[in-house]
């Protein structure tokens, strides 16, 4: 009952298929980093009574659980969690994540790569999300090939303090739209942000202040359904790399306010509009 650290507890137990922790008392645990990571055979995990109210670190918690298809996390309290980076990364068979009880605190700082390489994930629900202290959203949904529904309360998905958005939606090739009111005034890296988003037709860039951004490489690379873009808010006076920025945007008919692209510091424009 006095245990506070369960990090790496079952990490790398590659042959365990079923794990029932119904009677575990975890009320005082503060660290669950990597607790179930790399359990590549696990397909049945019972943690519905897990007490997580004091946990501060959930990073890599289910990392590379490539055979698990369902996670019931309704009992999870995340009010004190600071780190959720790579939490579900590599959960290749999960199709749906209901996380409406997640992200409800002001303490959360890291969510980079949280859902990366969840190949079959179709839907994520995060309607109570609070991201106002997040600085790193890089690789957040990277390689979520099947993701077609992203339920987010846009007023709470705050990006005011985010510095890094590189590869945030990389290869989300089934996502038809992204409804997020982006505030990017502190972001420095947007490289590969929407790369490979094959189904995206429109992206609202109204909140895109890019005055601090230095890297726009591959930003819209392979957005082959994109019809138009308005760069009205783009300020690119600090950008050094615009290579392959609009590469293979095959249906792109119109880029409004393209004159806003200040290229005075750009060193690389290779393939910028190639294949348009």
Where are these regions (language model features)?
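Negatively charged
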Residues: 1-276
